[in-house]
Regions:
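Gram-positive cell-envelope targeting signals
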Residues: 1-8
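N-terminal short leaders/motifs
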Residues: 16-19, 53-54, 77, 184-193
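Short, surface-exposed interaction patches in beta-rich subdomains
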Residues: 132, 138-141, 147-239
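Short Gly/aromatic-enriched secondary-structure transition segments
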Residues: 41-51
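A short, Trp-centered hydrophobic/proline-enriched beta-strand micro-motif
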Residues: 26-28, 46
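Right-handed parallel beta-helix
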Residues: 11-25, 34-38, 42, 57-139, ...
Length: 239
């Protein structure tokens, strides 16, 4: 792989610690290795790869400027092989920040209960999983991976996958949009057993034992207070 980015000379190589109060946004660019994000209320937080035997060029490179922490996979322009299992990333982040993750062939895990201003995850050939997220806005887009979500509280959430499945437990929200091509959508619960679901599909179907009212592609559960848009081609919706 060849990874290039601007202002390469402003980056520092290797595992590091940083002060939580100095960071309001974290950006991660990663490839062919897993990313685990943990949230902590500690004053000093750590960022580490799984193997310390990497060369300086192979190590993660990072920059902290104006409250934004950027983490790159390796030195800009480096081309070469990496030891197997050496590049799994574990990062601790503060509560309430903006988190942006862009990765290829990487599984992303947001572990434990986490609170953000905004979360954006873009992944190619990787799964995205979270245990519990509360954020004003959540955007998750993966090409061939699953979105395996736990509890989700968000003013607005957009979850998209091409050939993967989407599983979430929506707790509190104004609107959730879910899109798949060939994947299924699983809603583990509905807030107050209530939702207004717009389900657009070609060959998919609704699978539920809940009572509902139907009007064209709109399904009303309970009083219909919570709005969910689901768009699939051949995927089913189950709840």
């Amino acid at each position: 792989m060849l990874h290039r980015y601007a202002d390469a000379n402003s980056y520092t190589a290797g595992n590091f610690e940083y002060r939580a109060k100095d960071v309001s946004q974290v950006e991660i660019n990663w490839f062919s290795a897993d990313v685990t994000v943990k949230q902590s209320s500690a004053g000093t937080l750590s960022v580490a790869e799984s193997d310390r035997g990497l060369s300086e060029k192979q190590k993660l490179h990072w920059r902290l400027e104006d409250g934004k922490l950027v983490i790159q996979y390796c030195q800009s322009g480096y081309h070469g092989r990496f030891p197997s299992g050496a590049k799994d990333l574990t990062i601790e982040v503060p509560e309430g920040i903006q988190l942006d993750i862009d990765c290829v062939s990487s599984d992303v895990k947001l572990a434990g209960s986490q609170t953000y201003d905004k979360v954006t995850v873009n992944s190619v050939s990787g799964n995205v999983a979270f245990d519990e997220i509360a954020a004003d806005k959540v955007d998750v887009d993966t090409v061939s991976g699953d979105i395996n979500g736990g509890k989700l509280s968000s003013d607005k959430a957009d979850l998209k996958t091409t050939s993967g499945n989407v599983t979430i437990d929506p707790v509190k929200f104004n609107k959730i949009s879910i899109g798949t091509v060939s994947g299924d959508v699983h809603l583990l619960s509905l807030p107050d057993d209530s939702a207004q679901i717009q389900f657009s599909h070609v060959s998919g179907s609704l699978k539920t034992q809940r009572e509902y009212k139907k009007d064209a592609n709109q399904y009303i559960f309970g009083n219909g207070n919570n709005k969910i848009d689901v768009d699939t081609v051949s995927g089913d919706l189950s709840l």
